């Protein structure tokens, strides 16, 4: 609690498709650190603003409800409509985020943001943690878990900022190329730096 909880240190977790950012988020949660998922907050924001979005995007309404896939198809081929969507959803995401932060009252909070650098989030965070792995390894992981073809995975990769560029921008880079134990060790080193060695994970 105390005054420091009012202004938590917020660290963004990101990584390109198949990097293992969800594994890092799960490790942090298991060690007792709060991790917020920006995609989940965005889904809640869309739900909260559904009536407004239905008026703006009537073509994306299926059976009286806003169809997320139809909405995605509409906006990602039209920058103006994407801007209109973001104008409604982004302020609500920020409101929900502030609500969550005040509810948590934690001195250190992690925020999982898939498109952290692409969407310019780094200016709103105290630091950024990039989970990185070689492209071929990431492609293999995604194909194994999702059933997507190699071409589909590569198309998603091309839609993101190159990992090399993210490496230059990130505060910390976690190399996720070895075992889970290696990843845990690297993550604990970052935590020790963040907390002054006070709580670099348990065990």
From Swiss-Prot:
Superkingdom of origin: Bacteria
Pathway stated in the Swiss-Prot or TrEMBL entry: Cofactor biosynthesis; coenzyme A biosynthesis; CoA from (R)-pantothenate: step 5/5
Molecular function terms, GO-annotated: ATP binding; dephospho-CoA kinase activity
EC number(s) from the headed UniProt entry: 2.7.1.24
InterPro entries listed in its UniProt record: Depp_CoAkinase, P-loop_NTPase
PROSITE patterns registered for this protein in UniProt: DPCK
Signal sequence annotation: none
GO BP, sorted A to Z: coenzyme A biosynthetic process
UniProt-annotated location(s): Cytoplasm
UniProt-listed SUPFAM superfamilies: P-loop containing nucleoside triphosphate hydrolases (SSF52540)
Any one Pfam family match given in the protein's UniProt record, by short name: CoaE
Chain ranges of the DPCK domain: 10-203
GO terms under cellular component: cytoplasm
Reaction(s) catalysed (UniProt annotation): 3'-dephospho-CoA + ATP = ADP + CoA + H(+)
Entry function: Catalyzes the phosphorylation of the 3'-hydroxyl group of dephosphocoenzyme A to form coenzyme A.
Family named by the database record: Belongs to the CoaE family.
The protein's name in its UniProt record: Dephospho-CoA kinase
Name of the gene: coaE
């Amino acid at each position: 609690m105390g005054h420091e909880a009012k202004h938590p240190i917020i660290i963004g977790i990101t990584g390109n498709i198949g990097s293992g950012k969800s594994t890092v988020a799960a490790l942090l949660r298991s060690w007792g650190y709060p991790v917020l998922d920006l995609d989940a907050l965005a889904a809640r924001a869309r739900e909260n603003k559904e009536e407004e979005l239905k008026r703006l995007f009537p073509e994306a309404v299926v059976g009286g409800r806003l169809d997320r896939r139809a909405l995605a198809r509409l906006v990602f081929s039209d920058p103006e409509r994407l801007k209109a969507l973001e104008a409604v959803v982004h302020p609500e995401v920020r409101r929900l985020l502030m609500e969550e932060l005040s509810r948590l009252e934690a001195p250190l909070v992690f925020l999982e943001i898939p498109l952290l650098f692409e969407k310019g989030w780094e200016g709103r965070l105290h630091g950024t943690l990039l989970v990185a792995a070689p492209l071929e390894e990431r492609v293999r992981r995604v194909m194994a878990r999702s059933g997507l073809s190699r071409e589909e995975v590569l198309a998603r990769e091309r839609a993101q900022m190159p990992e090399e560029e993210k490496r230059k921008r990130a505060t910390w880079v976690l190399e996720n190329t070895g075992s889970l134990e290696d990843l845990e060790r690297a993550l604990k080193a970052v935590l020790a730096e963040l907390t002054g060695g006070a709580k670099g994970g348990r065990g």
